[in-house]
């Protein structure tokens, strides 16, 4: 009896625990459904009309450009990149293709280093070669620093970042010494001051750039990042700078998007704080104010997906992809949404994820998402086999 009594007591406790677990799970499921309905109810009605792109079609292909670099086809790279830059000098709206093309080099891929150095050595008077290497070095600087808070980042990491930035600065200086009309080079200089300088340094770099090319969206959008509150600016400054830019909107319709940047940043802050409904509201306001800008849709699409509203999220991500193709973040979220259980388009999700890797190289979350998609594909294959279809 002395042995049986504790056993009986344990059985009673296990039943109690099991019952409690069932109750808690039921409550969580009910709360989840209730919260989902509540979140949906709080989101204002979203109306999506036909897209009105603010830029000409983006035709630069980052995958092809990266492949040409690996093949050391410097003549083809020179012809491709300078053709985009020449078009932008004749029509500032074409600077979007310049940004897209040179972004192909903005990845911390060790395999890029040697061919870029070789290209610069072979063609010291090529602004395209210098700018391509600058993009790479700035990406390496970000990789060296890492994404953690400054208090969690070592002095060695900061030193490596500074070394890459210094090397990149030399390449930008060389670029502008050969061709002072390259807006992408000015944007990198402004970004450098944003990270390592002050608000005043950032504005000085921006003013010098805008003196040369006042209708550039590339220059003005990078300046807007300097004016964000997290970098010592304010939303009032952002709105004022956006309003001033409208003087040139007849030359470059893309400048209209700047009017939505303050609300876009508000949305980003809400998104980062897990406040997805307010984020959606701010992103929607940004679209209403600034028009069809890819980042606005990408931000809103992410917020929708974090609320498990994947159909809405996918619609926004597809719009972002149409407006600005080959963006890694857009492709990643497309893969995530397409692989959601209720969507189940895992083959399509895998294609988007593969393109993201081709565009920007692998990254930690990509491996996790890939494993999930592959697992679901395998399960789907087993289910199909079991059903005899």
Spans of features found by a protein language model:
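Short coil/linker segments at helix-helix boundaries
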Residues: 56, 60-68, 75, 82-125, ...
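Residue-level signature of tetratricopeptide-repeat
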Residues: 131-133, 189, 223, 259, ...
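Hydrophobic membrane-insertion alpha-helices, especially the h-region
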Residues: 18-30
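Juxtamembrane low-complexity tails/linkers enriched in Ser/Thr-Pro and polybasic
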Residues: 1-10
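TPR alpha-solenoid repeat register
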Residues: 129, 182-185, 219, 255, ...
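Terminal, low-structured helical/coil segments at or just beyond the last alpha-helical repeat
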Residues: 244-247, 350, 355-389
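Hydrophobic single-pass membrane-insertion segments
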Residues: 30-40
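N-terminal Sec-pathway targeting helices
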Residues: 9-21
């Amino acid at each position: 009896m002395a042995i049986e009594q504790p056993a009986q007591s344990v059985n009673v406790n296990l039943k109690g625990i099991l019952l409690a677990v069932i109750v808690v799970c039921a409550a969580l499921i009910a709360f989840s459904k209730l919260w989902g309905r509540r979140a949906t109810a709080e989101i204002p009605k979203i109306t999506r009309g036909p897209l009105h792109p603010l830029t000409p079609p983006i035709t630069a292909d980052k995958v092809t450009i990266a492949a040409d670099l690996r093949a050391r086809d410097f003549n083809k790279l020179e012809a491709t990149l300078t053709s985009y830059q020449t078009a932008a000098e004749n029509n500032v709206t074409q600077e979007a293709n310049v940004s897209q093309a040179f972004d192909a080099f903005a990845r911390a891929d060790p395999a890029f280093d040697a061919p870029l150095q070789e290209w610069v050595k072979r063609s010291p008077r090529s602004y395209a070669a210098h700018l391509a290497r600058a993009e790479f070095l700035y990406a390496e600087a970000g990789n060296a620093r890492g994404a953690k808070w400054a208090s969690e980042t070592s002095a060695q990491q900061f030193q490596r970042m500074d070394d890459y930035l210094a090397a990149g600065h030399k390449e930008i200086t060389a670029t502008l010494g050969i061709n002072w009309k390259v807006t992408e080079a000015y944007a990198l200089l402004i970004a450098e001051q944003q990270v390592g300088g002050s608000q005043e340094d950032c504005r000085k770099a921006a003013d010098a750039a805008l003196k040369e090319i006042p209708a550039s969206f590339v220059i003005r959008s990078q300046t807007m990042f300097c004016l964000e509150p997290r970098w010592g600016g304010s939303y009032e400054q952002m709105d004022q700078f956006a309003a001033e830019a409208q003087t040139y909107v007849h030359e470059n319709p893309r400048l209209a998007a700047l009017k939505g940047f303050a609300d876009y940043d508000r949305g980003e802050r809400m998104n980062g704080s897990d406040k997805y409904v307010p984020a959606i509201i701010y992103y929607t306001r940004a679209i209403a104010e600034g028009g069809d800008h890819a980042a606005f849709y990408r931000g809103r699409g992410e917020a929708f997906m974090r609320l498990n509203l994947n159909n809405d999220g996918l619609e926004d991500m597809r719009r972002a992809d149409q407006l600005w193709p080959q963006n890694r973040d857009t492709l990643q979220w497309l893969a995530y949404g397409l692989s959601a259980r209720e969507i189940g388009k895992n083959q399509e999700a895998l294609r988007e994820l593969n393109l993201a890797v081709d565009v920007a190289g692998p990254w930690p979350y990509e491996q996790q998402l890939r494993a999930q998609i592959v697992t679901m594909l395998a399960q789907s294959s087993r289910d199909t086999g079991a059903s005899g279809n």
